[in-house]
Amino acid sequence: MLVWLAEYLVQYNTAFNVVSYITFRSIMALLTALIIGLWIGSTVIRRLQILKFGQEVRHDGPESHYKKRGTPTMGGIMILFAIGVSTLLWADLRNPYVWFVLFILFGYGVVGFVDDYWKIARKNTDGLIARWKYFWLSVIALVSAFGMYAIGKDTAATQLVVPFFKDVMPQLGLFYIVLTYFVIVGTSNAVNLTDGLDGLAIVPLIMVAGAFALIAWATGNYNFAQYLHIPYIKYSGELVILCTAIVGAGLGFLWFNTYPAQVFMGDVGSLSLGGALGVIAVLVRQELLLVVMGGVFVVEALSVILQVGSYKLRQKRIFRMAPIHHHFELKGWPEPRVIVRFWIITLMLVLIGLVTLKLR
């Protein structure tokens, strides 16, 4: 929005030309989202307390979690608000990629909101009926996938980038839609499963989003894309604004979510942020790199799949409890230790992921 205003005002004062630079707008988007998050955080928490939107906990979970019952949830609302306002202010809204991410972010946010509301209304952890939850997640993802394919069909925007191989970029064709669907829905649910401890999901989200800000900038810059042997994608540069807005909103939320948490993001936050991360990875053609940098999310999701599969096939559990962060808690690790170690692992994976851009 401010891009349009600056384009008009630059004829009167060339200083407004600074708004045309992605680097300036990305910093401002981060600061705007951070300030909004810090500003509205306490108000949102008080409102959630008044509405009695408190967290329900699993009866079979670690005993240390019982004290979390009643902690305000659905704090993801403040994250979405901060990202939305920051993006509308600082992003170029003529860019279709911006709208694809916002569509997933707020579409999944609505699904997550309904899921959270049902958990609160029923006073259990079941939430929205699974088949309806995945139906709507799938519909939203497929609408985005078809739209993205229509814009980028038969161009670099629909190639698969393989880490470590600079000349291996197969054209996906219609398989692009299938891959996009699984990346968006899969990442959304993986982040949702990770969001079980104070600050456990939001910090890896911040790190990975920050890394994708760098990747989006490189992908949208022809010279850097050629230097790194990655596809140059016309619209991807503007995704830097969204990534930094996610970082800023995430930091603002972490202020209140750090151990011991004053608020939880709920499914309204985890489903939407995970979906946004997935669609950004698709748009910059780095789905495989997302698996590396988001390794913590992948392992959390795999631990649930393996646990359920093992129990159904062998009537035996692999872990003491899934997702895997609960396994470590039941082994005696204090919650802060689990959280910080997962953060450290994510930092290592993000750095490894960024290094692979050059190792080709």
From Swiss-Prot:
MF terms in GO: metal ion binding; phospho-N-acetylmuramoyl-pentapeptide-transferase activity; UDP-N-acetylmuramoyl-L-alanyl-D-glutamyl-meso-2,6-diaminopimelyl-D-alanyl-D-alanine:undecaprenyl-phosphate transferase activity
The reaction(s) this protein catalyses: UDP-N-acetyl-alpha-D-muramoyl-L-alanyl-gamma-D-glutamyl-meso-2,6-diaminopimeloyl-D-alanyl-D-alanine + di-trans,octa-cis-undecaprenyl phosphate = di-trans,octa-cis-undecaprenyl diphospho-N-acetyl-alpha-D-muramoyl-L-alanyl-D-glutamyl-meso-2,6-diaminopimeloyl-D-alanyl-D-alanine + UMP
Database matches in InterPro entries: Glycosyl_transferase_4, PNAcMuramoyl-5peptid_Trfase, PNAcMuramoyl-5peptid_Trfase_CS
Subcellular location: Cell inner membrane
Pathway given in the UniProt record: Cell wall biogenesis; peptidoglycan biosynthesis
Keywords: Cell cycle, Cell division, Cell inner membrane, Cell membrane, Cell shape, Cell wall biogenesis/degradation, Magnesium, Membrane, Metal-binding, Peptidoglycan synthesis, Transferase, Transmembrane, Transmembrane helix
Essential cofactor(s): Mg(2+)
One cellular component term from this protein's GO annotations in UniProt: plasma membrane
Record PROSITE patterns: MRAY_1 (PS01347), MRAY_2 (PS01348)
Coiled-coil positions: none
Role according to the record: Catalyzes the initial step of the lipid cycle reactions in the biosynthesis of the cell wall peptidoglycan: transfers peptidoglycan precursor phospho-MurNAc-pentapeptide from UDP-MurNAc-pentapeptide onto the lipid carrier undecaprenyl phosphate, yielding undecaprenyl-pyrophosphoryl-MurNAc-pentapeptide, known as lipid I.
UniProt record similarity statement: Belongs to the glycosyltransferase 4 family. MraY subfamily.
Name this protein carries in UniProt: Phospho-N-acetylmuramoyl-pentapeptide-transferase
This protein's encoding gene: mraY
